[in-house]
């Protein structure tokens, strides 16, 4: 009986080792962020021709005070209704920004950050094809984009290495021939590297 209790104790120590909550968001810690979200509205079956979606990947590096530098890439696809069909607009952007730690709890499990980012990339409308299915010609052009984004992000630690993200952001981009502003919201995971 004693051997089994000792074995159970050793297993419990192994399972709960590495649970020091104070070792989070230290300077030079890095994490890979993977995000997915909706753009320019909420998805509904009746509005499926107007919806858009985003995917992103980035590297976050922490500084003093729990602030972060973020460097990454994002893909946004937005649809515009046209007769019985829809015309896709795609944006491929790179991002560099700073996220200021606004709020955190005492156990370092929950964080709220506000960020500002610079964006640059490329936009294509209808895959670069000017002629539509009914013979009409698109006047929109493909082109390079530049601008910025403001982000509000909530993070909660699921484990010491896995973080759940919830975010909302507004992008403002010039240079394209379609909409300038894009509101986004979504979820993501951050995998802490060290």
Residue ranges of predicted features:
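Solvent-exposed loop/turn segments connecting transmembrane beta-strands
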Residues: 42-52, 65, 82-86, 174-182
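Short glycine/proline- and aromatic-enriched beta-strand/turn motifs that initiate or cap beta-hairpins
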Residues: 21-72, 190-194
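Predominantly the C-terminal beta-signal and adjacent terminal strand-loop region
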Residues: 78, 148-194
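Extracytoplasmic loops and strand-loop junctions of Gram-negative outer membrane beta-barrel proteins
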Residues: 38-42, 79-81, 133-138, 169-172
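Cleavable N-terminal export/targeting peptides
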Residues: 1-29, 194
């Amino acid at each position: 009986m004693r051997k089994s209790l000792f074995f159970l104790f050793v297993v419990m120590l192994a399972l709960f080792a590495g649970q020091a909550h104070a070792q989070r968001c230290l300077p030079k810690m890095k994490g890979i962020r993977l995000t997915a979200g909706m753009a320019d509205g909420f998805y509904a079956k009746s509005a499926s021709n107007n919806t858009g979606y985003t995917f992103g990947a980035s590297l976050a590096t922490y500084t003093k005070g729990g602030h972060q530098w973020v460097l990454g890439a994002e893909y946004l696809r937005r649809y515009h209704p046209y007769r019985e069909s829809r015309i896709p607009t795609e944006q491929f952007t790179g991002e560099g920004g700073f996220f200021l730690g606004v709020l955190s709890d005492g156990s370092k499990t929950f964080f709220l950050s506000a960020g500002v980012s610079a964006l640059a990339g490329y936009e294509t409308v209808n895959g670069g094809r000017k002629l539509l299915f009914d013979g009409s010609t698109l006047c929109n052009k493909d082109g390079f984009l530049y601008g910025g984004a403001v982000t509000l992000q909530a993070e909660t630690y699921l484990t010491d290495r896995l973080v759940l993200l919830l975010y909302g952001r507004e992008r403002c981009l010039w240079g394209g021939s379609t909409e300038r502003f894009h509101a986004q919201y979504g979820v993501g995971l951050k995998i802490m590297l060290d």
